[in-house]
């Protein structure tokens, strides 16, 4: 399996995988090689199981879930706040540089993969960075957040909100599950902490934070998750099934849209995903992709003949 990994751009069929074997073998490989790895399961539940496996086998701080950003389906148009936060956290992780040997893992599924995301440059422009010791007027920070769609409230309780009490500035980024508390001394950031919403108690201290808005609300170039990830290794249970699901969702949404020409601003297609994976390593449990048949096979587990 390591030899297959060392050959860039290969399509590798993993045969005779049973149970949680993929998680175990993949985790062992990732721990040795590092890098960015995107796992595409057949549905949300399978992706969640895979996520939990990697939480147990690797550093869970480097493992991210990438769900859809809508409740039930994009077809119904009802945004899911938790899904948006998880997607944004994964994108933020993909933007960070890694040292040699470090890794990050993204677990997703067809409906989530189908949704386009903002491009890295747009995300960088819309992100507000604050670190301890910065000279920053509170009014300037308020203006930056208001321009990014944040709402001022008395107490923050969900992403996209901020509050101000004297020199204490609370803000809830879309890339975090807990809000930040910035303590100002005059126009200097004196400390930054995460805190619990229910108790208001500090969870941990931070030296620097990125405050990310709801990226779905911004216009601009939108690309596939695979394009955003850049150089990565892709793991599919059944690549043809995933790409067919993506195209099926695209056709369903297209039938509901008043402006069909806008479909490409919301969803990718089979063709786009194949283009964005070109030249990247692909591991698969089923050799189902006619556009990219396996050029190597690895047998990891064997069963006794009946």
Can you name each region flagged by the protein language model?
Residues 1-304:
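ASCE RecA-like P-loop NTPase motor cores
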């Amino acid at each position: 399996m390591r030899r297959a990994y060392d050959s860039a751009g290969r399509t590798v069929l993993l045969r005779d995988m049973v149970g949680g074997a993929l998680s175990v073998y993949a985790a062992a490989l990732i721990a040795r090689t590092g890098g960015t790895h995107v796992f595409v399961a057949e549905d949300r539940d399978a992706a969640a199981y895979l996520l939990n496996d990697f939480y147990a086998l690797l550093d869970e701080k480097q493992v991210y879930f990438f769900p859809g950003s809508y409740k039930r389906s994009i077809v119904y148009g009802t945004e899911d706040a938790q899904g948006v936060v998880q997607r944004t956290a994964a994108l933020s992780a993909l933007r960070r540089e890694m040292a040699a040997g470090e890794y990050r893992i993204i677990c997703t599924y067809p409906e989530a993969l189908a949704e386009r995301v903002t491009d890295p440059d747009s995300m960088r422009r819309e992100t507000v960075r604050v670190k301890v010791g910065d000279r920053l007027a509170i009014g300037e920070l308020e203006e930056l957040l208001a321009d990014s769609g944040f709402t001022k409230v008395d107490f923050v309780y969900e992403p996209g909100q901020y509050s101000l009490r004297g020199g204490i500035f609370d803000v809830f980024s879309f890339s975090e599950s807990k809000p930040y508390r910035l303590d100002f001394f005059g126009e200097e950031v004196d400390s930054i902490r995460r805190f619990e919403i229910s108790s208001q108690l500090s969870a941990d201290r931070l030296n620097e934070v990125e405050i990310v808005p709801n990226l779905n609300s911004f216009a601009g170039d939108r690309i596939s998750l695979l394009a955003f990830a850049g150089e990565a290794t892709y793991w599919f249970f059944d690549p043809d099934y995933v790409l067919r699901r993506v195209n099926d969702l695209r056709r369903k949404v297209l039938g509901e849209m008043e402006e069909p020409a806008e479909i490409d601003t919301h969803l990718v297609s089979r063709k786009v995903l194949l283009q964005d994976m070109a030249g990247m390593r692909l591991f698969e449990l089923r050799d189902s992709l006619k556009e990219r048949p396996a050029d190597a096979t690895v047998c990891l587990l064997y069963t006794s003949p009946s």
